[in-house]
Amino acid sequence: MAKLTKDELIEAFKEMTLIELSEFVKEFEEVFDVEAAAPVAAVAAGAPAAGGAAEEEKTEFDVVLTDAGAKKIGVIKAVREIVSGLGLKEAKELVEGAPKAILEGASKDDAEAAKAKLEEAGASVELK
């Protein structure tokens, strides 16, 4: 197998959907026995020393679909509206594979809007 350059890898990642990238990261973590979130956890562990302001400073949120509920079709439609460029098959797999992250690193307003839309469709959602 030919060795890919960093630029070639970046170009390949640009063509992937968020779901494909998420699955890639999970498989990468399993194969190499590493955690991509380890540095973030170390930073978050140091934050409480600054006082109780850590909650106020959080600017990025993950929207996690915990349960699709009884109305899966409505939830699939909502997921497709929230995640641009997502096909019907990918949205269905995402909903059926709950719990799954729908949005990662979203602003507070975007995360709350996505949560409201998913809950309106009948899903159970968490913001992390």
Swiss-Prot record:
CDD domains (UniProt xref): Ribosomal_L7_L12
GO cellular component, one term: cytosolic large ribosomal subunit
One Pfam entry name: Ribosomal_L12
GO molecular function: mRNA binding; structural constituent of ribosome
The organism's place on the tree of life at top rank: Bacteria
Record key words, sorted: Ribonucleoprotein, Ribosomal protein
GO-annotated biological processes: translation
Assembly description: Homodimer. Part of the ribosomal stalk of the 50S ribosomal subunit. Forms a multimeric L10(L12)X complex, where L10 forms an elongated spine to which 2 to 4 L12 dimers bind in a sequential fashion. Binds GTP-bound translation factors.
Function: Forms part of the ribosomal stalk which helps the ribosome interact with GTP-bound translation factors. Is thus essential for accurate translation.
Record-stated family: Belongs to the bacterial ribosomal protein bL12 family.
Name recorded for this polypeptide: Large ribosomal subunit protein bL12
Organism: Corynebacterium aurimucosum (strain ATCC 700975 / DSM 44827 / CIP 107346 / CN-1) (Corynebacterium nigricans)
GN (gene name): rplL
